[in-house]
Amino acid sequence: MIPGVSMEMLNLVDAGEIDIAAIIRPPFSFQSDLRWTTLAQEPFRLIVPRGVKGKDWAALLSEHPFIRYDRASFGGRQVDRFLRRMHFTVREMCELDELEAIVRLVENGVGVAIVPQTATYRRWPAKVRAVDLGHHTFHRDVGLVHRAPQHLSEPVKLLLQLIEAQALKKS
């Protein structure tokens, strides 16, 4: 296993340097010899400091400094597209690529953010409150990118099957 950002991992699979990568689904189609298996869908939420009152996500977003999820990441691009589609102008405080750091800043009252509700954050920290985006909710797909099965070794095929089976159990 090696850590890395989604684009780097995708490039390594495409180059044949690694067999499988767990990544955020990119906003573009894969080449014909690459396959995608969705493992989870994570809804985006507006997170605010616990003491901030109100349930209207649009009002909260316009009234408070915005901590932006990095636009260089696939998830951050989704947030950026959402804001543009909604014709929303935010008071940007900073831009970060680390979700945990974003949550910590919100927890400390620095501002608000739109982030995916990941498995790590099934429950938000005590000082953070999540506000649903209602019918505007969007998701990011987390999954596996790999080469077509005929290009994989038997142990890798077996691993892929086990991961897919486990993901099906949880969904």
Label every PLM stretch briefly.
Residues 17, 76-89:
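Ligand-binding cleft/hinge of the Venus flytrap
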Residues 1-29, 95-96:
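Central regulatory/effector-binding core of bacterial HTH transcription factors
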Residues 131-171:
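A late-sequence structural motif
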Residues 33-71:
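Flexible hinge/capping segments at coil-to-helix
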Residues 22-32, 99-129:
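A ligand-binding cleft/hinge motif common to bilobed small-molecule-binding domains
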Residues 8-9, 56, 100-102:
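Short acidic active-site motifs
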Residues 12, 16-17, 38, 65, ...:
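Conserved functional loop/turn residues at catalytic and ligand-binding sites
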Residues 35-45, 117, 126-139:
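Short beta-strand->loop
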